[in-house]
Amino acid sequence: MSGDGINIGGFEIKYYGMIIATGFLLGLIVSYYAAKHENKFDPELVFDYLITMIIPAIVGARLYYVIFSWDYYKNHLSEIIQIRNGGLAIYGGVIAGAITLYIFCKKKHLSMLQFGDVAVKGLLVGQILGRWGNFFNREAFGSYTNSLFAMQIPTNFFIEHGRIDEIVSNGLYDKATYVVSGNEAATFIQVHPTFLYESMWNLVLLLLIIFFFTKRKKFDGELIAIYCIGYGIGRFLIEGLRTDSLMIGSTGIRVSQILALILAVFGTAFILYKRKKITK
């Protein structure tokens, strides 16, 4: 066993991959029972959709990450298909999953909105767990902080993994803290654990959707819209703390914040449109 994973027969299984896989599995279980509870379509179709969606979601998540990190990958083409060490963007996976859902529902003659209201619950479970993969990879963290929630990461981790530039370029290395504990001493950076913030935000959103909004749902697709609003607002706020955001070229504009705004606006517009239609 290493800090990054478990070694079985000479093959190292990364914690990152195990957490992503666990997120898929638990998300599937939650969506299955949600479909069973709502009883609007055969719950077994949730399994069929997951099998159909896994590969496109992973490809989409990786493609999104590579596109917005092209300045690096254009000189490291062989690394494009290496995902064991991270580099999967949630937005890319969600977009690919949504496209796959549209095609799947068309072929199965299902309501995409009904199916989507069930799927977002599993999606949130996957996102809640998936962010902990970032913890083990020591990525997706925020700027310097000395608050109660500060996460300490040894600078040696970045040196050993050839990632020292990550904390030098954003000024975190200059703010590193030298800590002595007994006979041992190490240098740490102190950062916002943005992966934790997003994981907890999504947990609250999931609980609200399951225990509050599901019972009060007035039309198909309402839970999708609430997810878009809730996740969009949370992601926009939390993304502002991160030091590794994917940018639009050299503009300094964070891609994820733009998409978060689009999600929130879309969700709000959809709810207003549907509720206005109901009152007519």
Which positions does each model-derived feature cover?
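A feature for loop-to-transmembrane-helix boundaries and adjacent hydrophobic helices
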Residues: 1-280
